[in-house]
Amino acid sequence: MNITESLGYILANTGRKLTQHLTLKFEPYGITSEQWSVLHWLTVEDAITQRELSKRTEKDPTNITRILDQLERKGWILRKANVEDRRSYLIYVTPSGRDLSQLLFPIEIEVTREIEALLPHGQIEHLKHSLRTISQYMNNTK
């Protein structure tokens, strides 16, 4: 079998291209798609720990720390000491971070619709179901 026909290759390659496309759309706003995904999670649920954010985004803690450092430097989030556990910090979205997330969300929806328009609705739903099944399986193989 040719490597380009491997499911892993196709998934990774497609995911990378989608990430690059979204990052290109976000470039005028000074944020990458990876940074935006974390910022968006925080706008949905503010004041969570880095550890909890890492679990919810399924990103490793080192990667989350790097992304949060970038978001904090840009003034889009704040880290405050957790009064319940002094070893951890709670992450808060600043007003400018919340504004940016709300500005970018329609762009993400537009890109999603653009991609979903390539296939009939039934195929999109089947694809999502299949990808969730694979993702759950991979979660259980750790």
Locate predicted features.
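N-terminal leader segment of winged-helix/HTH proteins
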Residues: M1-Y29
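Charged, amphipathic alpha-helical coiled-coil/dimerization segments
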Residues: T19, D69-H129
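Residues within helix-turn-helix
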Residues: Q50-R51, T62, D69, Y89
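C-terminal regulatory/oligomerization modules of transcriptional regulators
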Residues: G122-K142
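Pre-recognition alpha-helix immediately N-terminal to the DNA-recognition helix
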Residues: K17, H21, S37-H40, D99
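The alpha-helix within a helix-turn-helix
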Residues: S54
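Short, locally clustered residues in the helix-turn-helix/winged-helix DNA-binding domain
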Residues: A12, H40-V44, F105
